[in-house]
Swiss-Prot record:
SUPFAM superfamilies: Ubiquitin-like. For the sake of clarity sequence features are annotated only for the first chain, and are not repeated for each of the following chains. Belongs to the ubiquitin family. CDD domains: Ubl_ubiquitin. The keyword Nucleus applies. This is Polyubiquitin. Residues 229 form a propeptide. GO terms for cellular component: cytoplasm; nucleus. Residues 1-76, 77-152, 153-228 form the Ubiquitin-like domain. Keywords: Cytoplasm, Isopeptide bond, Nucleus, Repeat, Ubl conjugation.
Amino acid sequence: MQIFVKTLTGKTITLDVEPSDSIDNVKQKIQDKEGIPPDQQRLIFAGKQLEDGRTLSDYNIQKESTLHLVLRLRGGMQIFVKTLTGKTITLDVEPSDSIDNVKQKIQDKEGIPPDQQRLIFAGKQLEDGRTLSDYNIQKESTLHLVLRLRGGMQIFVKTLTGKTITLDVEPSDSIDNVKQKIQDKEGIPPDQQRLIFAGKQLEDGRTLSDYNIQKESTLHLVLRLRGGN
């Protein structure tokens, strides 16, 4: 059958293909016609980026369908995402991609909704609005994917200045862990933080559930003076 490939310059290329042709194979045909190396090609159909190992029929691409060819910037790179089951997913990304964007790509590959994904790199949980380059994530870096349990919840932390911080936590998170999240958001070292809930100072080794801290609970953050106890 014939399909069309439209480039960003508006040029349309016609290709002779079989439904069983793989995406790599199609990229090879584009290279033969246009001289563009496959690793610089990104093919889009119905808003989805096509993965090399899949076939045209996998994506329901039929005769006279039109694919869109986007050139991968030299900054394009691959990163790896390792799940708790030990499976490793490979993603094609740009340094400028946001974390939301990466979660969307994981959903496209694995079917996991972004709101159930927590991505960790170098021990830090990655925030949706930030980009890969913000976290200095470079080519062939490995991120860790932790599934947010249905028990995932939000809590609030109120500072002495009256500011309220929202945190995504699990009931099983330790107090140290919560202090780490506060440091990630606010830059306050954990050893300067004292967290108070229901009039009690929270101990590092305990968990939120130990203190019966539930969703939308409010903790109070008091700064520990240097040299204070």
